[in-house]
């Protein structure tokens, strides 16, 4: 028992240090947006002037370094959030390109990989994917070649999900995004980060 704890002590210290940095990041976002007790009051009706909700979204945007955030209790799970993002950004005739291989099984019906009513495919959105290399890294030349004039949105899944591959790092994702932007600067890139912002420091 003690030997195992000693062996893992440096790893636990590393995790604790990362957790402190990320906790400070979230607290700084809350302080910047002056979160106080009034933001936790319930609201009724349509949510107009719901300062608590609006402020929570500002906190998320600041903590995750994004332009904006959509944080609602009506979004019930990760697949629901991804479906909302895909549906909002893709129109008939557009192409969705997944560059980290096949996404989660739950997205197959959303996209239309497996036939499903109201899928993106039914609305005229085409789908292609670029598989990862055998070592689990991005196939950058294949990604570069796959991006076309029709490609409207590029999907990256950070987590390995149920695949036997390593989780993608922020550095790897950044490199892939740079390749995509070099080919098509205006393409929308969506990263399913799966809480990855808390396992690294950004």
Language-model region placement:
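Conserved PLP-enzyme active-site core in the AAT-like
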Residues: 4-9, 16, 26-27, 31-39, ...
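Short beta-strand to alpha-helix junction loop
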Residues: 48-52
């Amino acid at each position: 028992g003690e030997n195992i704890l000693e062996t893992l002590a440096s790893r636990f210290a590393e995790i604790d240090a990362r957790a402190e940095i990320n906790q400070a990041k979230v607290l700084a976002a809350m302080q910047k947006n002056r979160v106080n007790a009034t933001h936790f009051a319930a609201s009724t009706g349509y949510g107009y002037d719901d300062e608590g909700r609006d402020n929570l979204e500002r906190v998320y945007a600041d903590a995750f370094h994004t332009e904006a955030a959509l944080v609602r209790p009506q979004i019930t799970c990760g697949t629901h959030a991804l479906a909302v993002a895909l549906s909002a950004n893709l129109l008939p005739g557009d192409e969705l390109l997944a560059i980290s291989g096949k996404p989660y099984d739950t997205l197959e019906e959303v996209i239309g990989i497996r036939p499903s009513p109201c899928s993106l495919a039914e609305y005229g959105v085409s789908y292609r994917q670029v598989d990862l290399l055998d070592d689990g890294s991005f196939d950058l030349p294949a990604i570069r070649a796959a991006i076309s004039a029709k490609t409207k949105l590029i999907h990256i899944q950070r987590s390995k999900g149920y695949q036997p591959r390593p989780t993608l790092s922020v550095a790897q994702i950044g490199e892939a995004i740079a390749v995509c932007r070099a080919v098509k600067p205006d393409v929308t890139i969506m990263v399913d980060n799966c809480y990855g912002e808390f396992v690294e420091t950004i």
